[in-house]
Design a protein with these regions (language model features):
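PAPS-dependent sulfotransferases, especially Golgi type II membrane carbohydrate sulfotransferases
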Residues: 1-47, 91-119, 139, 157-201, ...
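Proline- and acidic/polar-enriched loop/turn elements at helix boundaries
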Residues: 17, 75-77, 150, 230-231
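Phosphate-binding active sites in nucleotide-utilizing proteins
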Residues: 27, 36-140, 144, 148
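Conformational gate/switch positions in structured elements
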Residues: 57-58, 152, 211
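Conserved coil-to-alpha-helix start sites within the AMP-binding
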Residues: 130-134, 154-155, 185
């Protein structure tokens, strides 16, 4: 039983939404108060694919990395490590350093060099990187940011019924999920206002219902020439190490949209 299992996990992890509220507020305050000097342009373009977990990020990465000029990096932890180690835990050095974003860019690229040696474009598909968009834009001024959006009830239900390791303890309780989703929405609204025209909003429902047009617009946003292989993403043999690997290996089907309606009577807490 999903509800009983999640209740047990909530009791084990002792997750409190207040910690995430504090984190999100700190990021908004930081970028409200300061205008940073961005890093220099990097010859390698990083395509960040982010949003709520289960919003279609694996599918979008599979599409983009089917392009002949793009390396699919997968769910990388590099940015999370750098933000926590170099910024959150060393805030005094962060505020005083003039070259902090150049240094962070170099460290990130050094980590990535072990995976990608040949491509000038690669993807980083860690959904929770939406928390660090201000850092991304300053570290990689020429990066592309794809924000995957999906129906609130669908994405929250999918988080609730799929089990994750690590940072997704908010997904064990429907009330926590509802509050976390609100935090996510508020933060994304802040980023979009702070950095207009830097974030590409990709609606999951639009991708499912109008695939070819949506994919062509997406590839155009990434400043890539059109490659018809992006429409055959399900034939891409790259490894996928997330719970979405089965969906990302299949052609796009319309019945994927709004699957939560089957469980509507259980989901009043999310509305």
């Amino acid at each position: 039983n999903t509800i009983k299992a999640n209740l047990l996990m909530k009791n084990i992890t002792k997750y409190k939404i207040e910690k995430d509220k504090k984190l999100f507020k700190e990021k908004i305050n930081l970028f409200n108060e300061k205008n940073f000097t961005p890093a220099d342009y990097n010859k390698t373009k990083v395509i960040f694919i982010l949003g709520m977990p289960r919003s279609g990020t694996s599918l979008v990465e599979q599409i983009v990395s089917s392009h002949h000029a793009v390396f699919g990096g997968g769910e990388l932890s590099y940015l999370n490590l750098l933000v926590n180690e170099k910024i959150t835990n060393n805030s005094e050095i962060f505020y005083k350093s003039n070259n902090i974003f150049n240094n962070l860019q170099k460290e990130y690229m050094s980590m990535m060099s072990n995976k990608n040696k040949n491509f000038l474009n690669f993807t980083d598909k860690s959904p929770l990187n939406f928390r660090w968009i201000g850092f991304i834009i300053n570290m990689f001024p020429n990066s592309k940011i794809i924000h995957c959006k999906r129906n609130k009830i669908d994405v929250c239900w999918s988080n609730f019924k799929n089990k994750f390791e690590g940072a997704l303890n908010f997904s064990n309780d429907l009330q926590d999920l509802k509050k976390y989703y609100q935090l996510y929405e508020n933060l994304m609204q802040f980023w979009e206002k702070k950095f207009p025209n830097k974030i590409y909003n990709l609606e999951h429902e639009e991708l499912i219902n109008n695939s070819e047009k949506t994919i062509k617009n997406l590839i155009n946003f990434c400043n890539l020439d059109w490659d018809k292989n992006c429409l055959k993403h399900h034939e891409n043999k790259r490894a996928i190490k997330t719970v979405s690997f089965i969906q990302a290996r299949k052609p796009i089907y319309k019945e994927k949209v709004k699957n939560s309606f089957l469980y509507d009577k259980y989901l009043d807490e999310l509305k």
